[in-house]
Amino acid sequence: MLKKEESLMNIAKMIDHTLLKPNATKEEIKKVCEEAREYGFASVCINPCFVDLAYEMLKDTDVKVCTVVGFPLGANTIETKVVEAVEAVKKGATEIDMVLNISMLKSGEYDYVKKEIGEVVKAVKSHGDIVVKVILETCYLSDEEKIKACEISKEAGADFVKTSTGFGPGGATVEDVKLMRKVVGENFGVKASGGIRSYEDAKAMIEAGANRIGASAGVKIVEEWKKQGLG
């Protein structure tokens, strides 16, 4: 897991190059994969229907294939999330970004939330070294709920907590990233996503404690980083 200083020195290696818009075409997905190959991003984060395509394009690289589960509302049943996650892994995904059940969290149904995360984690990790990131959708949560979601995610065996889907009314904030890092500690992943459009945005999130960045502006971020003489 990259430390803060290492992240700023290798910024491409901690970006999930993302294209999740509903009208993304196959050609646009191919372009994202080509960019990921060229820049050496940590992963491409794409919708489940494109996992097999991304896998074929990137299987001879170090770029991981990341996809989303229960996206973007988190309101699917546990069983549906498990099936969706396992199918994605079988098609070549090695990172799963799952949206927790926001409604259940806000209803205080913490055992349910822990169970759903745990079931997905157990199912995908039985197929190999799969990274599970739990999307909290922080814009809908109080600080107390953010803290509880982080604690539950860690207890349930996930590898990362992630701020946002990018489809809610708000994205990543420095304050939320700092809070999430404080709760999960050093040896756990924090992914900032939603509204990160520049190197300065990414740098602020890294300095706040993020060690993965989700962004559709990955190329722009790296090019700005290079212009500052850092790459």
UniProtKB/Swiss-Prot annotation:
Q: Name one GO molecular function term.
A: deoxyribose-phosphate aldolase activity
Q: Which reaction does it catalyse?
A: 2-deoxy-D-ribose 5-phosphate = D-glyceraldehyde 3-phosphate + acetaldehyde
| Active site: residue positions | 97 (proton donor/acceptor), 162 (schiff-base intermediate with acetaldehyde), 191 (proton donor/acceptor)
The record's subcellular locations are: Cytoplasm
- Matches recorded under Gene3D superfamilies: Aldolase class I
Q: Which UniProt keywords apply?
A: Cytoplasm, Lyase, Schiff base
The record ties this protein, via SUPFAM superfamilies, to: Aldolase
Look at the named UniProt entry and state the broad enzyme category this protein falls under: lyase
Superkingdom: Bacteria
Q: Does the keyword Lyase apply?
A: yes
Record pathway: Carbohydrate degradation; 2-deoxy-D-ribose 1-phosphate degradation; D-glyceraldehyde 3-phosphate and acetaldehyde from 2-deoxy-alpha-D-ribose 1-phosphate: step 2/2
Could you give one GO CC term from the UniProt record?
cytoplasm
EC number annotated for this UniProt entry: 4.1.2.4
Enumerate the Pfam families for this protein: DeoC
Which GO BP terms sit in this record? 2-deoxyribose 1-phosphate catabolic process; carbohydrate catabolic process; deoxyribonucleotide catabolic process
Protein role: Catalyzes a reversible aldol reaction between acetaldehyde and D-glyceraldehyde 3-phosphate to generate 2-deoxy-D-ribose 5-phosphate.
Family as reported in the entry's similarity comment = Belongs to the DeoC/FbaB aldolase family. DeoC type 1 subfamily.
Record protein name field: Deoxyribose-phosphate aldolase
